[in-house]
A protein has these predicted regions:
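Domain-scale recognition of soluble eukaryotic interaction modules
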Residues: 3, 75-169
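Compact alpha/beta protein-protein interaction domains typified by the UBC
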Residues: 28-98, 107-108, 117
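Glycine/serine-rich phosphate-binding loop and adjoining beta1-alpha1 elements at the start
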Residues: 142, 152-342
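Phosphate-binding loop/pocket of nucleotide- and phosphate-handling active sites
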Residues: 304-323, 548-602
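Glycine-rich adenosine-cofactor-binding loop
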Residues: 335-375
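Glycine-rich phosphate-binding loop and adjoining beta1-alpha1-beta2 segment
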Residues: 375-411
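Adenosine-phosphate binding glycine-rich loop
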Residues: 469-565
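Conserved beta-strand-loop surface patch within small alpha/beta domains used
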Residues: 567-666, 674-719
Length: 719
């Protein structure tokens, strides 16, 4: 028999039936304007002893459309199995795909559709349709409408109706907000039995059907709550919520949230808890009256007659959503709930700092104290996570308000804000107390002065990490202290500079003349770099913060972004040996000491030497010895003397000063003694005098280091 189909897809199904042999056409009908194709699918490969009773040939009805996924109905007595939808009228449809139709549209055709139906039946017969790595099926079908609730614990909630494109949402708002929304009584029932069948049950339409869906008597539990609800009249909530009007209480809506444990097999702990909410009555009064209760003359609820019509009360299903909170945020970001307990102080909420903070806030990670003295200005918005509403506000305070809006202030992870810089004398006690109580300090100031002050004055026993970008915004740098603070930020800063001068690809890392003036002051300049980079690097920072506690090691890390790829440079932080000399603290790289020992040994029996590269910190009287320049080619090396040459030396010093923008420079000389003694000879003292005469012209002390057989000595001469 020839059939003329209205839809192109139906025509293609008929063509593919004969071409594939996957089934036989029974009929094509127009039912209430819908084109219904009835097909006998099969014969199929069904096991002799199937887990579920699937026939070799199954009759299905397909409602065909051209621009959506066709609906496939199976026989009415088909067993309830996973991936089967049971409609309110009892009819059953196959759940063929676990993704939206638009996601498979490009591969979807009539042949693929028919083969998918066969696959569904054959795998269902073997109980293999639901894969082991797939989430368990919900207990009831999904619904479009939803409730968005907090975890306040009250049996009363005020809900505001929000119309979306395809659904209605009821969002919890403040109970005290009597001008908006409606008050609902929210009751809950916990189903003690764990369900293991992994099937979607038919959505109940009445209170009685809801009760029949479980072995436990949830309506009896519901009834026991009536007196408790009525007793609110004896509490302060009666005035807050209902303005002491009994009519308002009686006219409250009633919601019932049911929690069901779902397991894959008998005896296992629940893999997930499924929660479904139902509006079980339009008003509290109509509900308790259906159960036979009335208000007595003593103004109490009393049962005066047997329950009659309560099982026929229509119910409305809702999906349950909880307000965003830190634990939910942690879960959604694949963290563990215990992770968010760390007390962390963040200094600096600028472009990079605000986006790091935003990442951690949205992950529910940490308990934070923010420190920043600056206000938000219009030019900041190019790379700051805040918006126009925050202009003029202190950045730290505005970020706290930002977090409050995400978590509704009930579960905020921003515990304190200090609206001053870390040098503020009036806030020192508060700043030091916050840091001493923290497990980590995150420095995002991009300020050497702040980093040094934190390292030497504030940190105490608290580990610190410093994040900053280079002037062009093409690289992110992380300086991470060791857990015991034996390696601190200041020496990691020196290792960062050394990395720049030793890696030729990084020689232009700090060069930039790209600044834009945002005010008429001489300091009113802001660096120019893409928001894209700040966003990428902030993600690396927040990820690094979450991994810090898993390792005690210190590191210097740099991520360079170029041509849509990232290159990482990583150096393990090293301990700098400390020596006191003439009122100065000498900090010298341990690996550099080893390097000088090696050069001495290689040149024996002669002496050798070179130039010391480092920096001075006059605030803390520290001399950093970071690197050396090897003995120039025209140097004279003898068993009892060393005369350092000068070939190419000045050019090398100028280059490293340019690379590090003056943060490393010439600080003195080193040479070796063939013997174990590192005492200076009279010629060494003359050398030290000449060194100091040269360096004092730049305002620096002169430094001389002598390396012996197994020890070394440092000599410092200043004014």
């Amino acid at each position: 028999m020839d059939y003329t189909c209205k839809t192109a897809f139906a025509t293609n199904i008929l063509k593919n039936l004969s071409a594939t042999g996957l089934g036989k056409l029974v009929s094509v009908q127009d039912i209430d304007g819908a084109e219904v194709i009835t097909i006998d699918i099969g014969p199929m490969e069904i096991p002799q002893y199937p887990v579920y009773l699937v026939k070799t040939i199954e009759r299905v009805n397909i409602i065909s459309v051209d621009d959506d996924l066709p609906v496939v109905y199976c026989r009415d007595d088909f067993p309830i199995v996973p991936h089967l939808n049971v409609l309110p009228d009892g009819r059953k449809t196959l759940c063929l795909f676990d993704v939206p139709f638009n996601d498979i549209r490009y591969t979807f055709n009539a042949s693929m559709f028919l083969r998918r139906i066969v696959y569904w039946f054959e795998q269902t017969a073997r109980a293999q349709l639901h894969q082991a790595d797939q989430p368990l099926e919900p207990y009831f079908p999904g619904t479009c409408d939803g409730l968005i609730l907090s975890d306040s614990g009250y049996p009363f909630v005020r809900l505001k109706r929000i119309k979306t494109l395809n659904s209605i949402l009821y969002k919890e708002i403040a109970l005290e907000n009597i001008t908006e929304g409606r008050v609902y009584i929210l009751l809950s029932a916990v189903i003690k039995k764990n369900y293991t069948k992994n099937i979607i049950n038919r959505m109940p339409q009445t209170l009685g059907e809801l009760d029949d869906a479980f072995e436990e008597n949830i309506l009896k539990e519901l009834e026991t709550r009536f007196s408790e609800i009525w007793a609110v009249k004896q509490t302060s909530l009666y005035k807050t919520i209902f303005q002491e009007k009994e009519t308002e209480l009686r006219n409250s809506g009633v919601l019932l949230a049911i929690r069901i444990g779902l397991s894959r097999s008998e005896g296992e702990e629940p893999e997930r808890y499924y929660i479904k909410a139902f509006q079980v009555s339009d008003t509290f009064q109509s509900l308790y009256q259906a159960f036979g209760y009335h208000r007595s003359k003593k103004n109490k609820l009393e049962k005066v007659k047997p329950a009659e019509d309560y099982k026929n009360i229509s119910i409305i299903p809702f999906e349950m959503f909880y307000q965003f909170n830190s634990q939910f945020a942690t879960f959604l970001n694949e963290g563990t709930i215990t992770e968010h307990n760390d007390n962390i102080v963040q200094i600096g909420l600028g472009a990079l700092g605000s986006q790091i903070a935003n990442n951690c806030i949205r992950a529910g990670y940490g308990n934070w104290t923010y420190i920043d003295p600056d206000a938000l200005y219009p030019h900041n918005l190019a790379r700051h996570c805040l918006n126009q509403d925050s202009i003029g506000q202190n950045k730290a305070q505005a970020m706290q308000q930002y977090a409050n809006l995400l978590f509704h202030g009930k579960d905020n992870i921003i515990k304190a804000v200090i609206s001053s810089d870390i040098f503020s004398k009036s806030e020192q006690e508060k700043i030091r107390a916050s840091i001493s109580e923290a497990t980590l300090v995150v420095d995002c100031t991009a300020s050497v002065a702040a980093e040094r002050y934190l390292s030497h004055e504030l940190a105490g026993k608290t580990r610190s990490v410093s994040f900053f970008m280079n002037p062009t915004g093409t690289a992110l740098i992380m300086l991470l202290e060791s857990a015991d603070r034996s390696i601190t930020l200041d020496v990691l800063e020196m290792q960062y500079y050394r990395l720049l001068i030793r890696e030729k690809k990084l020689w232009h890392h700090l060069k930039s003349d790209r600044k834009v003036l945002y005010s008429s002051t001489c300091r009113g300049a802001s660096l120019v770099y893409p928001q894209d980079n700040a966003s990428i690097f902030s993600g690396l920072c927040s990820s690094a913060i979450k991994q810090i506690f898993s390792s005690p090691n210190a590191t210097v890390s740099m991520w360079v972004y170029d041509d849509l790829s990232i290159t990482r440079y990583k150096k393990i932080g090293e301990i700098f040996q400390e020596i006191n000399c003439n009122g100065w603290k000498i900090k010298i790289s341990s690996s550099l000491i080893t390097q000088m020992y090696d050069q001495r040994r290689n040149k024996l029996p002669n002496e050798t030497g070179g130039v010391l590269i480092g920096a001075y910190d006059y605030e803390h009287n520290i001399c950093y010895i970071v690197d050396i320049i090897d003995s120039p080619s025209d140097s004279e090396e003898y068993p009892n003397a060393y005369v350092r040459g000068h070939n190419g030396l000045l050019k090398q010093i100028e280059r490293l000063e340019e690379i590090t923008i003056g943060n490393l420079t010439y600080i003195g000389e080193w040479h070796s003694h063939p013997t174990a003694s590192t005492q200076p000879s009279k010629y060494d003292l003359i050398l030290l005098k000449s060194i100091s005469d040269y360096t004092l012209a730049q305002g620096n002390p002169g430094c001389m280091l002598i390396v012996g057989d197994s020890n070394f000595s440092v000599y410092l001469q200043s004014i």
